């Protein structure tokens, strides 16, 4: 495994969450442990009419300007785990103790995060590296929630004239 090849302590739980620990570099031994978090699952979607099996076929990638894209499918990965592995493998970086937390089944409901035994982690500061945009840092909390509600509805026969209203070009925070 990556962790074993780099001489790093590692742990995998029954939900397939992975924790990899890297000791602090010289001079940072007493610093707080930082948890770097990402997820290892992907959205398996393909374009209409594309014959592709995500369990057996390899993603066909190509470069489009500054972007890497996939032919007919989702690209297959977020960059969080790649960033974490790059940090863990670079012995030239000065850093506090690091715990890499790589969770499972984020895309289908954060199942790995919900199943995680947090007592396995020693750090109290977590940086979630799962973001939509390169070069953008979000200060927020990570989480997910499903809400189910019921609203009593009664239907009536439609009368009058249907119209469509469009409002465009306004400045907004969303």
Residue ranges with predicted function:
Residues 1, 58-65, 166-174:
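Short, intrinsically disordered, charge-balanced linker/junction segments flanking boundaries
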Residues 1-32:
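A non-catalytic alpha/beta surface segment that caps or lines the substrate-entry region
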Residues 11, 19, 35, 128, ...:
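Structured core elements
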Residues 11-15, 62-66, 159:
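Short, ordered beta-strand-loop transition motifs
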Residues 22, 38, 63, 72, ...:
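Pocket-edge structural micro-motifs
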Residues 28-102, 107-108, 114-119, 123-124, ...:
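Active-site metal-coordination/substrate-binding segment of hydrolases
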Residues 95-172:
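Fold-level recognition of mixed alpha/beta catalytic cores in primary-metabolism enzymes, strongest
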């Amino acid at each position: 495994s990556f962790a074993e090849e780099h001489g790093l302590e590692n742990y995998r739980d029954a939900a397939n969450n992975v924790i990899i620990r890297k000791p602090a570099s010289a001079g940072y031994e007493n610093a707080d442990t930082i948890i770097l978090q990402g997820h290892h699952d992907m959205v398996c979607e393909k374009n209409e009419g594309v014959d592709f099996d995500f369990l057996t076929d390899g993603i066909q990638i190509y470069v489009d300007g500054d972007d890497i894209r996939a032919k007919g499918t989702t690209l297959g990965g977020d960059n969080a785990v790649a960033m974490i592995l790059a940090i863990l493998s670079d012995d030239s970086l000065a850093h506090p103790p690091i715990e890499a937390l790589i969770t499972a089944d984020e895309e289908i409901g954060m199942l790995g995060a919900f199943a995680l035994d947090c007592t396995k982690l020693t750090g109290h500061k977590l940086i979630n590296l799962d973001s939509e945009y390169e070069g953008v840092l979000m200060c927020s909390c990570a989480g997910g929630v499903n809400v189910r509600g019921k609203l009593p509805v009664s239907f009536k026969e439609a009368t009058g004239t249907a119209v469509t209203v469009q409002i465009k070009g306004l400045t907004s925070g969303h």
